[in-house]
Swiss-Prot record:
GO terms for biological process: cell division; establishment of mitotic spindle orientation; microtubule sliding. Self-associates. Interacts with NDL1 and dynein. It comes from the Eukaryota. InterPro entries: ASTRA_WD_repeat, Dynein_regulator_LIS1, LIS1_N, WD40/YVTN_repeat-like_dom_sf, WD40_repeat_dom_sf, WD40_rpt. SUPFAM superfamilies: Lissencephaly-1 protein (Lis-1, PAF-AH alpha) N-terminal domain (SSF109925), WD40 repeat-like (SSF50978). GO terms for cellular component: cytoplasm; microtubule; microtubule associated complex; spindle pole. This is Nuclear distribution protein PAC1. It is found in: Cytoplasm, Cytoskeleton; Cytoplasm, Cytoskeleton, Spindle pole.
Length: 444
């Protein structure tokens, strides 16, 4: 068979082959082989550490092949991102459905490099701004359209920030942080003034592990219509604070171990604990309403999803379920729970249902290989971030895995946040943070 090579290339290949054989076995006599190939017999090289030409080309081909495979993967990712960015909208209805069902592209639009591992990220509810907290206790504010320099930066705590939350109320942006220094602090932010400390709350006796800020329902007899703050701690307590007055309105112990995370919806508060349980509490009264059992290791994050329902439907029939929540754990699973409806009595706070006081596990989501540290939600989707360096998007209504971002960070993924699918500006943003000191921004 004729080789697809010129005479000169054939001669160089024969010489390189003989040179390689002599380099491999210096005692071999290749004179006869050289004569049969009609090339000059090579001489023994003095530098025995130098690879012959054939070996160098062979390793170069392997490196080029790996590079080609990497470039082909990048092309596929970029093509996928381009299709998502330029997908046409055929009608207002289909465009709105696609926006609500949006899933972030494979590659981030931009990345922010911080001075230490990222511990928390929160999007501004109204502006294209993200707040990032770090292991060194610093709180940064970045414009998503220009991340070259932060809009504001402050040393918020003396130790690592463990949790951050943002809320807009009466034309003011409030940023709340919890820290390992046992402090809870509230800052105000504006484009002109930056971050300004409004108030510090001292009352916990151990690490503050989670914070949430919201406006209390006017129907409650405690903090109704006021700006409230909830914090949980390793001291096993949950505290409700009035941001304006600085008073602690309520303190209760939903668990007997470290309360690692919490979320608030109206007058209901849900917590996850070191003992692997979850608990739903009516925070104005402190009444424990129901408990979630099913995780094998500590619960790392918890979040209400969807909307909570009234006890009686519009048709007058009793509704057995209050709503849904999602929890993530060190057992490498996430669970979608149905929350049982508490018993409501006239002129009295809710109490546990007499026959049904346990969460019902609707779905168990498996796909991560390590601890699942954080969870975010957007419409019918929940996003779980794990120590296996990946993020997975799930449809929480049916438990289906929709997309997985492998090696989204070079280390553990510690936090995630997404914009609200009902945002009036119809934006599509996802941000993640990791111990690689990076904050990745996915947007369209």
């Amino acid at each position: 068979m004729d080789l697809p090579l010129s005479d000169e290339q054939i001669r160089e290949l024969d010489e390189s082959t003989l040179d390689y054989l002599l380099w491999r076995n210096k005692g071999i006599d290749i004179t006869q082989l050289a004569n049969s190939l009609q090339v000059d017999a090579p001489t023994l090289q003095e530098d025995t550490n130098r690879l012959p030409l054939l070996a160098r080309k062979w390793t170069a081909i392997a490196r080029l092949q790996r590079r080609i495979m990497s470039l082909e993967q990048n092309i596929r990712d970029l093509r996928e991102a381009s299709i998502e960015m330029n997908a046409p909208a055929f009608s207002p209805e289909s465009s709105e459905s696609a926006r609500i069902a949006w899933i972030a592209p494979a590659q981030p639009r931009a990345s922010i490099t911080l001075e230490s591992p990222v511990t928390g990220v929160r999007l501004h509810p109204e502006l294209a701004v993200v707040f990032v907290s770090t292991e060194q206790g610093r709180l940064h504010c970045f414009d998503l359209m220009d991340i070259t320099l932060p809009l504001a930066s402050i040393q918020a705590h003396t130790r690592a920030i463990t949790s951050v939350d943002v809320f807009c109320w009466q034309q003011t942006t409030y940023v709340v942080t919890g820290s390992k220094d046992m402090q809870v602090r509230v800052f105000t932010w504006s484009a002109g003034q930056g971050l300004k400390l409004l108030r510090s709350f001292a009352g916990h006796e151990h690490v503050v592990s989670g914070v949430r800020i919201w406006v209390g329902p006017r129907t409650t007899n405690i903090g109704g219509g006021s700006l409230l703050l909830a914090s949980c701690s390793r001291d096993t307590s949950v505290k409700i604070w009035d941001v304006n007055s600085g008073w602690c309105l309520k303190s209760f112990q939903p668990h007997s171990d470290w309360v690692r995370c919490l979320d608030v919806y109206g007058e209901f508060l849900i917590t996850g604990c070191q003992d692997s349980t979850l608990r739903l509490t009516h925070w104005p009264s402190g009444n424990g309403l129901s408990v979630g059992l099913g995780h094998d290791f500590p619960v790392e994050s918890v979040r209400f999803i969807g909307s909570l329902q009234d006890a009686v439907t519009t048709e007058g029939r009793t509704n057995n379920w209050l709503g849904h929540c999602v929890s993530t754990s060190r057992d490498r699973t996430s669970k979608i729970w149905l929350l049982p409806q508490p018993r409501r009595l006239p002129q009295r706070p809710p109490v546990p249902h007499s026959t049904d006081a346990q969460f019902l596990c609707k779905w168990t989501l498996r796909g991560h290989d390590s601890w699942i540290k954080a969870v975010g939600s957007r419409g019918d989707h929940v996003f779980t971030a794990s120590d296996d360096k990946s993020v997975i998007c799930w449809n929480w209504t049916n438990g289906q895995c929709l997309k997985k971002w492998n090696r989204i960070h070079q280390g553990f993924v510690t936090c995630i946040d997404l914009d609200d699918s009902n945002h009036p500006l119809k934006r599509k943003i996802m941000v993640t943070g990791g111990i690689d000191c990076k904050c990745h921004i996915f947007m369209q």
